[in-house]
């Protein structure tokens, strides 16, 4: 990869890291059969992709969009949500008889504190010096 080719591209893509990512993605596209927009001239795919970016036959913004799309694991599709969502425990829902008989035992703060006082504190373990 000639340094001149990179220097020609740096005014099209400001960040060298982004330039390398875009050129590598375009080189992979060329390897997978994407048509060339310039003559090859016995150059390898990375050099051809840099020359395409330098000659502005390929848009860096389009390449970036394709790169992001190729790296996505899940494609988000905005689907409209249904207007009416049934509420949990609504009148139309069936309720088992066993669920209605469950009663919660209530405890006052004083009873809770008395119960906590009855608990034994954890035993202290001697620290080992190394």
Swiss-Prot record:
Name of the gene encoding the protein in the UniProt record: rpoZ
NCBIfam families: rpoZ (TIGR00690)
Function: Promotes RNA polymerase assembly. Latches the N- and C-terminal regions of the beta' subunit thereby facilitating its interaction with the beta and alpha subunits.
Name of this chain's protein: DNA-directed RNA polymerase subunit omega
Lineage of the organism: Bacteria, Pseudomonadati, Pseudomonadota, Alphaproteobacteria, Hyphomicrobiales
Entries under Pfam families matching the protein: RNA_pol_Rpb6
Oligomer status and interactors: The RNAP catalytic core consists of 2 alpha, 1 beta, 1 beta' and 1 omega subunit. When a sigma factor is associated with the core the holoenzyme is formed, which can initiate transcription.
UniProt record similarity statement: Belongs to the RNA polymerase subunit omega family.
Gene Ontology molecular functions: DNA binding; DNA-directed RNA polymerase activity
InterPro entries in the record: DNA-dir_RNA_pol_omega (IPR003716), Pol_omega/Rpo6/RPB6 (IPR006110), RPB6/omega-like_sf (IPR036161)
Organism name: Rhodopseudomonas palustris (strain TIE-1)
GO BP of this protein: DNA-templated transcription
Catalytic activity: RNA(n) + a ribonucleoside 5'-triphosphate = RNA(n+1) + diphosphate
Keyword Nuclease: no
EC number: 2.7.7.6
Keyword Nucleotidyltransferase: yes
HAMAP family documented for this protein: RNApol_bact_RpoZ
Cellular component terms (Gene Ontology): DNA-directed RNA polymerase complex
Annotated segments matching region Disordered: 108-130
Keywords, in A-Z order: DNA-directed RNA polymerase, Nucleotidyltransferase, Transcription, Transferase
